[in-house]
Amino acid sequence: GLMEMDDLKFSYVDNSIYDLFARSRWISPIFFSDTYRSAFEIADYSNRTFYNGKLVIATDDSKLKTPPGLKPGIHWTEIESTIRAAGGGGCFSLEEVATVYDIIEDLLIKKTYSGTIGIIAPFRNQATRLQDRIFGGDIPQEKLLHAELHVDTAHGFQGDERDLIIFSLCSGGEMPRGSLGFIRNKTNLFNVAVSR
């Protein structure tokens, strides 16, 4: 039968363990206000957008491993692409997959970037296509291993971090409505993606 309304609070789809305990009258949440993880521009974005200015940004940007020729922060690459529907409400973009591969190849082969790299996509189908392309391509496996290259959705990156994150948004005007709704309604996952 259908779950009782009271049981819905235990649904991992809608609530994290933190959410469940934070609503308990016996437990007081603790907010870790200092952040050392991201460049100022990224941490400031998360602070203003998700934390109402409560974060203390304590990152030493001089210790961040940035690719040659770039400064720490958010960099945007616009890609003309077709967003295709995938099963389960997700979507994918073959053009984004190709562009991300080219970026990784440029970083690891031409620029010999020595930091760790993560690639995050909001949709499982896009993450799988990215992983298959990158690990099945011409980039030497030892370079991918040295970069600790990890491709996943935001769920797979919670609690993890990399020196450099590439976020394959897989978004556009013709994206499926369900996918657009997912991005709009899961802002916490967007925060995970940009703050790793």
Q: Where are the language model's segments positioned?
A:
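Conserved helicase motor core of SF1/SF2 NTP-dependent helicases
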Residues: 1-196
